[in-house]
């Protein structure tokens, strides 16, 4: 059964630095500054937790960014692992903390569209039209980078992905830091993306300097990525903004092959989520597509002993005694987007040998949900 996990309980603390005591926010009562030796590449650090978006907390979080630290940031899509996008050393720490391949580019986050000209060359009118309609929101635009944006941030590309997140805490931190924040999803590379602070604690506690709890993510899947450097524009990753909404502004949009399959070895990804296996729980996943009734019956008939199920609400009763995670009603793709990563991640805490998942059709937000499930499965898909 799907359950929304609450944020960890928080208690006020004082943080000691350079012999001084100063209030920085809140810290989970059960996670008080654990020192964890994570790896030889990334030394253990004390993680400070912020909860209330006070002026003091925003400034303290911004200082972490300015000083080259790593900060978990809330957005409407998923939680991000943020650093100063212009600081190559800080950006390198993102890759090390996540275990992320360095040819996998990062998205930079800005507080509004006026920042586009700071970091992008030859910004086309279409970019401003999209920003006017969809920013702040779950849309990333690929544009030519200015030299101020390091190649380390862009994965070696001459383009950069830019978005304005629809979360007041993160926009306030960006504005206070006065630098763009490079932020991939805050999970360990390859795992399901974090949609609440508990997920961030699970993956990054003791690896990064700060985490800002902004509550559960309203959208639940990453941003849609559109490449505006080609004609027609190209969808590189489906996400929280449906393809149909983009085409209402831009006209026809091509869909990159990476949306429906993995890139081959040697092919360079132009955006996050294109090349590598992503979003995967520990147990192998099989995705079953087709009519919801037919796919549910197929899983019921073929489900191995010890396997778990991700299914639509209407079909939970077909799997008594099984480990089940409810993806939401078959017709409610927005709810499926909010639940998909939680369902995948929760199976890591259960004794399942493999996972069978129902999958929505690709209309609207269904394209993003389908993409995340299929990537979690390494595109191991059964059509019924």
Which ranges hold each PLM region?
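Active-site-adjacent structural elements in enzyme catalytic cores
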Residues: 33-34, 38-384
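Absolute N-terminal positional cue centered near the fourth residue
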Residues: 4-7, 48
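Serine residues within intrinsically disordered or low-complexity segments
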Residues: 7, 29, 37-39
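Intrinsic-disorder-associated, low-complexity terminal segments enriched in Asp/Asn/His/Tyr and depleted
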Residues: 2, 26, 35-38
């Amino acid at each position: 059964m799907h359950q929304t996990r609450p944020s960890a309980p928080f208690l006020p603390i004082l943080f000691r630095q350079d012999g001084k005591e100063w209030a920085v926010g809140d810290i989970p009562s059960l996670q008080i500054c654990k020192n964890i030796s994570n790896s030889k590449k990334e030394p253990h650090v004390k993680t400070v937790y912020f909860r209330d978006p006070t002026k003091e907390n925003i400034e303290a979080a911004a200082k972490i960014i300015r000083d080259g630290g790593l900060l978990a940031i809330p957005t409407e899509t998923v939680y991000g692992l943020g650093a100063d996008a212009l600081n190559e050393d800080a950006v390198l720490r993102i890759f090390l903390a996540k275990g992320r391949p360095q040819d996998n580019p990062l998205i930079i986050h800005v507080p509004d569209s006026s920042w586009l000209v700071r970091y992008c060359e030859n910004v086309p009118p279409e970019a401003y039209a999209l920003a006017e309609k969809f920013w702040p929101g779950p849309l990333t635009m690929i544009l030519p980078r200015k030299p101020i944006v390091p190649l380390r941030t862009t994965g070696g590309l001459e383009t950069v992905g830019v978005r304005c997140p629809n979360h007041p805490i993160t926009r306030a931190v960006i504005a206070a830091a006065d630098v763009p924040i490079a932020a991939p999803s805050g999970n360990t590379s390859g795992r399901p993306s974090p949609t609440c602070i508990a997920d961030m604690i699970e993956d990054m506690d003791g690896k990064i300097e700060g985490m800002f709890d902004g509550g559960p993510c309203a959208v639940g899947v990453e941003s849609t990525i559109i490449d505006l450097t080609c004609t027609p524009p190209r969808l590189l990753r489906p996400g929280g903004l449906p393809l149909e909404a983009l085409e209402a502004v831009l006209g026809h949009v091509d869909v990159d092959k990476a949306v429906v399959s993995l890139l081959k070895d040697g092919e360079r990804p132009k955006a996050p989520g294109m090349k590598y296996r992503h979003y995967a729980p520990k147990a192998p996943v099989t995705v079953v597509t087709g009519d919801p009734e037919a796919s549910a019956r197929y899983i019921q008939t073929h489900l191995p002993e010890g396997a778990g199920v991700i299914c639509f609400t209407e079909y939970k009763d077909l799997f008594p005694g099984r480990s089940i995670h409810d993806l939401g009603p078959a017709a409610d793709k927005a709810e499926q987007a909010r639940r998909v990563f939680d369902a995948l991640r929760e199976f890591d805490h259960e004794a399942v040998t493999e996972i069978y998942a129902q999958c929505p059709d690709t209309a609207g937000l269904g394209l993003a949900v389908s993409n995340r499930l299929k990537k979690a499965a390494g595109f191991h898909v059964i059509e019924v």
